[in-house]
């Protein structure tokens, strides 16, 4: 709305008036268009992006950044939020989005750091978050009241594997870190062993027998590492030139059957899909939200709703009620059409309270597909 833009311009002017030496910035949500006037108010700009968690794939971050930079070479671009959840008790040999495994979180941050390192035009990147933190309305990954996007657990006692990919990029002291150490029980004859390190080369041994040496940078992967039944000692050593400069060992136990506790059963069928919007699952004070077959709900995409005449009318009505005077451009609708309505609600945060979510879902339930 005009009032929003006037307010942002006023805040930007006030910041410069208070301190002319400091640059101003602003954090945009993903759905703010590349050519939005919002990107031309402050000195520099940042975006909150969760490709690879709430929507899309982690690999989608790179083309988005390059497209924005190509279209706006004069804008100094940063990432003000990015991250995904990882719970140290959950594990997978084939990690996927929404399995909440420590392995998927580590993979996500591997790809993000790789993306950032290849794009020196970024003025900043801000990982969300260093530590797991309290969030009383959340219920994700089998954990109530907590956001699990931290690189370190809530009690500050456990550094997740994702912590060590940052250490590999940033520290100068030589180290090796064998990943998936809490994924201790394995039912497979062979496993993949991944090591994070800032060394030039990493050598791997199992029960004292050398498996291989790999030269690389930050991420060292050893495939088809054999395990015998019972305990196996996995040892990784880091080298600078020909000299071994660090090493560590962890136990892995070969078992007959997979450990079911490593998998979040209620989310197992949804693994590989984007994370749900915790805000839009219904509040405890009322009946659960309904998702009748053949009718719309907040789980449907905006684009599908706009193709339905009744749905398009409802969208127009809601925009008028919730954002009076705000003009929604075709470009914004085109971008939003790929999101579920749940995702749009999540982006809006506390501007859309639970009772409004319930009302919206009830209205959608009356529209036949």
Question: What is the predicted function of each stretch?
Answer:
Residues 242-256, 264:
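Edge beta-strands of extracellular beta-sandwich domains
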């Amino acid at each position: 709305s005009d009032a929003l833009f006037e307010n942002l311009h006023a805040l930007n002017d006030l910041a410069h008036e208070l301190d002319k030496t400091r640059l101003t910035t602003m954090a945009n949500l993903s759905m703010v268009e590349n050519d939005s006037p919002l990107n031309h108010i402050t000195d520099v700009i940042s975006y909150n992006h969760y490709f690879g968690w709430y929507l899309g794939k982690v690999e989608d971050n790179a083309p988005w950044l390059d497209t924005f930079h190509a279209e706006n070479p004069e804008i100094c671009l940063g990432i003000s939020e990015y991250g995904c959840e990882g719970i140290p008790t959950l594990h997978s040999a084939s990690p996927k989005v929404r399995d909440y495994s420590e392995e998927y979180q580590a993979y996500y941050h591997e790809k993000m750091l790789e993306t950032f390192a290849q794009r020196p035009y970024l003025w900043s990147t801000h990982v969300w978050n260093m530590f797991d933190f309290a969030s009383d309305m959340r219920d994700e990954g089998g954990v109530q009241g907590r956001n699990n996007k931290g690189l370190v657990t809530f009690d500050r006692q456990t550094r997740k594997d994702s912590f060590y990919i940052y250490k590999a990029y940033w520290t100068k002291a030589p180290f090796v870190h064998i990943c998936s150490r809490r994924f201790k029980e394995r039912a497979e004859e062979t496993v993949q062993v991944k090591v994070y390190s800032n060394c030039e080369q990493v050598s791997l041994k199992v029960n004292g027998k050398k498996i291989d040496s790999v030269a690389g940078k930050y991420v060292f992967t050893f495939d088809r590492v054999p395990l015998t039944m019972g305990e196996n000692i996995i040892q990784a050593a880091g080298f600078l030139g020909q000299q071994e400069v660090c090493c560590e060992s962890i136990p892995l136990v070969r078992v007959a059957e997979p450990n079911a506790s490593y998998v979040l059963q209620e989310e197992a069928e949804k693994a590989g899909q984007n994370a749900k919007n915790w805000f839009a699952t219904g509040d405890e004070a009322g009946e659960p939200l309904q998702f009748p077959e053949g009718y719309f709900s907040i789980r449907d995409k905006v684009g599908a709703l706009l193709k339905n005449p009744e749905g398009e009318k409802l969208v127009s009505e809601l925009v008028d009620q919730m954002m009076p005077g705000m003009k929604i451009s075709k470009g914004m609708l085109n971008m939003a059409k790929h999101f579920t309505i749940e995702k749009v609600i999540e982006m809006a945060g506390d501007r859309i309270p639970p009772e409004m979510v319930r009302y919206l879902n009830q209205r959608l339930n009356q529209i036949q597909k």
